[in-house]
Amino acid sequence: MIKRERYMQQIRPFIGNELIKVLTGIRRSGKSVMLELIKNELQEQGISNAQFITFNFESLANAKYCTATALYEELSTRIAGVSGKSFLFFDEIQEVKEWEKCINSARVDFDCDIYITGSNAKLLSGELATYLGGRYVEFVIYPFSFEEYLECKKQGQEGQLSIVAEFKDYIDLGGMPFLTNLHGDRRASMLYLRDVYSSVILKDVVKRNNIRDVDLLERIITYVLANVGHTFSARSISNYFKSENRKVAPETILNYIKACCDAYLFFKLSREDIAGKKILSVNEKYYIVDQGIREAVYDGNTRDMDQLLENIVCMELIRRGYTVTIGKSGEKEVDFVAQNGNEKIYVQVAYLLSSKDAVDREFGAYDAIRDNYPKYVVSLDDYDMSRDGIKHRNIRDFLLTDKWE
């Protein structure tokens, strides 16, 4: 188990205070392990095991507590036997009907510190905003970054890792934490990733949104997977189905894709007019949370290397807390405009800069951008081709850089 220090740095200031800590993210991204890491830190501070009260609602043992009233009654009983502050951990809380009422009552009635996890962005919408508005802080937990992937691979392994070889595996298998237990067994990894995908689709998309046409959903997902990092519209998908003699309204397509985004399977990036600093409402792009899932479900990661490298960089920017958009500057496009508070960077991603035309095209994306924020061109090339103040970085080095500036 690695420490996942980037997340712990975000969570640590809130440990022990009255705000409810909400950990969200796609299933199997490591939210339960984060709860264990938090417990470990509390134990190091002198908190006893008797002060921890834990519910995992994926376990049948806790099925009898899957209503707000039943859970609150059980909490009351357990907390009565605790000396001092209670530390409450609820894993996959969305399985509890009207859970927000129970959590809010616990916050008000008991001396406690509350941590919850869930696998859907809707966890923090609707009624929860009414019950807990301003009283919670959210942390999205993602699959392993390349840095975390390497950290995990180094555990229990003698000698130096080959960064180049490991990155090839990372492109293929992705960063779902459990894969480290499979020791690079590709067949087992693909089976596991397909199971994760099926679980997400069934529990967090179909069941949660009452989707009846599962075949249509999966065909839409396949279309999005094929077009990761490419511009498309709901109407273009609708026309695609029309060519196959199937009528599907663009609104239905948008609703299905949004349901997948709510389950943290896809992330939508809007287009930004850099000069006018306006968000445009057309030509969004979608990226998948983990490239290994794409390989398991769709296949072709090595065939679509330009798309996959772009996807990996996009998710790394999001993972580090940046708000990411696609940059439009005149007739040219910058892959990513990433902003985090006062920090801002531009990133252009390419597979290989194998010709002068390729170099001119990628660096030329910045021709009309006159500000002084850092600008990067990232590719698999090892030779540094930086020019005109624009930094060229090998993608492996870029992903392993602690701070971009």
Predicted regions and their residues:
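Short glycine-rich substrate-engagement loop in P-loop NTPases that contacts/grips substrate
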Residues: 54-84
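Conserved lysine of the Walker
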Residues: 31
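Accessory nucleic acid-recognition modules appended to NTPase machines
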Residues: 186-344
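Hydrophobic anchor at the beta1->P-loop junction of P-loop NTPases
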Residues: 23
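Catalytic cores of nucleic-acid endonucleases
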Residues: 327, 351-396
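Hydrophobic positions on the alpha1 helix immediately C-terminal to the Walker A/P-loop
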Residues: 34, 38
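Pre-Walker A adenine-sensing motif
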Residues: 2-16
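Interdomain motor-coupling "hinge/lid" segment immediately C-terminal to the ATP-binding subdomain
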Residues: 121, 126-231, 264
